[in-house]
């Protein structure tokens, strides 16, 4: 039989700052919104962007487990930043490379539901961490991510480092 899986390696903590109430992990910070009402995927992305962050992109098993553990209520599955790109492939909204995936069995299935305007072009994460493509208009929880920051501008807003490498280190 297979050797038992070792827990995934944890990145060394970053030395930057997070927005208030956001949780640091590696060199990023995370927040899961999971109130009762839920948000459509476009509304969820808008909430992240309203504080100059982006829907979460996930680059390792360790990062996935960290986000799963932040989602401590059972209200919703949570939207992540994976969506159809122009070429009908899948891409992260923050333009980081799609190197790690964790689709549920049989997904993505691009199901089309008669009577619904939207095909399954947005991706949710189940409580077990698996991913499913679903109708973007469904209301769910969601997770945002930002790079840790070191300085603020004259209005006390964080100056986020640009993620030129795209790595989720």
For each of these PLM feature ranges, what is it?
Residues 1-169:
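Extracellular, disulfide-bonded carbohydrate-recognition/adhesion ectodomains
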